[in-house]
């Protein structure tokens, strides 16, 4: 295009308007401006706007997909947390039930052992009492016989 400094220096001031005289140049510049705008719109702006619009649609579609995946991930997370919580509660109940069963088994075994020990002690003590009684009876007979022997020896 024409350099502005050359245009200003080559213009001569003749008449009342000088450089800013309204003659055929202003409509010519306006027509050039409109032609330039139409050309730029056809050549540059339309393809650029279509590319921008395609990019916008691409970003929006991927954003929607990402939002859907995020929602699915949140749903799965809550579902897995609920499953984990129920599994944890079931495990705690299983542990508590197992502990109660083992405690009952231990109590039963302890009772059986205690009864066995009591019966064994009863048997041993009755055996000892019987042996003591027989020993005392035999000692009594021995003492009686010894006493009679001593009496017979003393009376001689």
Swiss-Prot record:
Transmembrane segments: 24-44
UniProt keywords, alphabetically: ATP synthesis, CF(0), Chloroplast, Hydrogen ion transport, Ion transport, Membrane, Plastid, Thylakoid, Transmembrane, Transmembrane helix, Transport
Misc. comment: In plastids the F-type ATPase is also known as CF(1)CF(0).
Subunit note: F-type ATPases have 2 components, F(1) - the catalytic core - and F(0) - the membrane proton channel. F(1) has five subunits: alpha(3), beta(3), gamma(1), delta(1), epsilon(1). F(0) has four main subunits: a(1), b(1), b'(1) and c(10-14). The alpha and beta chains form an alternating ring which encloses part of the gamma chain. F(1) is attached to F(0) by a central stalk formed by the gamma and epsilon chains, while a peripheral stalk is formed by the delta, b and b' chains.
PANTHER family for the chain: ATP SYNTHASE SUBUNIT B', CHLOROPLASTIC (PTHR33445:SF2)
Organism of provenance: Thalassiosira pseudonana
Principal localisation: plastid
HAMAP family membership: ATP_synth_b_bprime (MF_01398), ATP_synth_bprime (MF_01399)
Topology versus the membrane: Single-pass membrane protein
Family: Belongs to the ATPase B chain family.
Protein known as: ATP synthase subunit b', chloroplastic
Subcellular location: Plastid, Chloroplast thylakoid membrane
GO terms of molecular function: proton-transporting ATP synthase activity, rotational mechanism
Highest classification ranks of the organism: Eukaryota, Sar, Stramenopiles, Ochrophyta, Bacillariophyta
Role summary: F(1)F(0) ATP synthase produces ATP from ADP in the presence of a proton or sodium gradient. F-type ATPases consist of two structural domains, F(1) containing the extramembraneous catalytic core and F(0) containing the membrane proton channel, linked together by a central stalk and a peripheral stalk. During catalysis, ATP synthesis in the catalytic domain of F(1) is coupled via a rotary mechanism of the central stalk subunits to proton translocation.
UniProt GO cellular component terms: chloroplast thylakoid membrane; proton-transporting ATP synthase complex
């Amino acid at each position: 295009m024409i350099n502005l400094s050359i245009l200003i220096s080559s213009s001569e001031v003749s008449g009342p308007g000088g450089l800013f005289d309204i003659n055929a140049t202003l409509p010519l510049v306006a027509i050039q401006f409109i032609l330039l705008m139409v050309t730029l719109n056809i050549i540059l702006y339309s393809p650029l706007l279509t590319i921008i619009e395609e990019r916008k649609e691409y970003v929006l579609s991927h954003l929607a997909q990402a939002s859907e995946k995020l929602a699915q991930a949140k749903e799965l997370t809550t579902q897995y947390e609920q499953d984990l919580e129920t599994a944890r509660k079931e495990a705690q109940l299983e542990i508590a039930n197992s502990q109660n069963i083992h405690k009952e088994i231990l109590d039963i075994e302890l009772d059986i052992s205690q009864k066995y020990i009591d019966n064994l002690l009863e048997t041993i003590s009755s055996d000892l009492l019987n042996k003591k009684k027989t020993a005392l009876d035999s000692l009594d007979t021995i003492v009686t016989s010894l006493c009679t022997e001593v009496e017979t020896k003393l009376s001689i």
